[in-house]
Swiss-Prot record:
Keywords: Chloroplast, Membrane, Photosynthesis, Photosystem I, Plastid, Thylakoid, Transit peptide, Transmembrane, Transmembrane helix. GO terms for biological process: photosynthesis. Residues 126-145 are annotated as: Disordered. This is Photosystem I reaction center subunit VI-2, chloroplastic. The chain crosses the membrane at residues 102-118. It comes from Arabidopsis thaliana. The lineage of its organism: Eukaryota, Viridiplantae, Streptophyta, Embryophyta, Tracheophyta.
Length: 145
């Protein structure tokens, strides 16, 4: 692997595209051309043809289901398989929570009330400075504290 000193040569031979003005001193970076030269292979240019179905049909008015996709996959006209009382319950009590704002307010009120309850029922002696000494003090070597 070539070091940076061999890549950034003093004599300009080929400029690195995109790195010309990136040096801190303001000098341009140059590299020596490689010893191997890669020859590009000539390729034939051809037209790209995208096909939908037969005979290059891209939009078929006769078959809109396959052209635009099936939009009624999840729709159903069948009656609800759930109990009517259960359906009425969820339509009545879950309807306010379908809107994002109401759901957010409910979550904020619930979280605030939970924090209030926890802070009211917690004990304040969590820190050792508030609890005070837990054991009687030990006397020193001369019988003093």
């Amino acid at each position: 692997m070539a070091s940076f000193a061999t890549i950034a040569a003093v004599q300009p031979s080929a400029a690195v595209k995109g790195l010309g003005g990136s040096s801190l001193a303001g000098a341009k970076l140059f590299i020596k051309p490689s010893r191997q030269s890669f020859k590009t292979k000539s390729t034939r240019a051809g037209a790209v043809v995208a096909k939908y179905g037969d005979k290059s049909v891209y939009f078929d008015l006769e078959d809109l289901g396959n052209t635009t996709g099936q939009w009624d996959v999840y729709g159903s006209d069948a009656p609800s398989p759930y109990n009517p009382l259960q359906s009425k319950f969820f339509e009545t009590f879950a309807a306010p929570f379908t809107k994002r704002g109401l759901l957010l307010k409910f979550l904020i009120l619930g979280g605030g009330s939970l924090l209030t309850y926890v802070s009211a029922n917690s004990t304040g002696d969590v820190l050792p400075i508030k609890r005070g000494p837990q054991e009687p003090p030990k006397l020193g070597p001369r019988g003093k504290l």
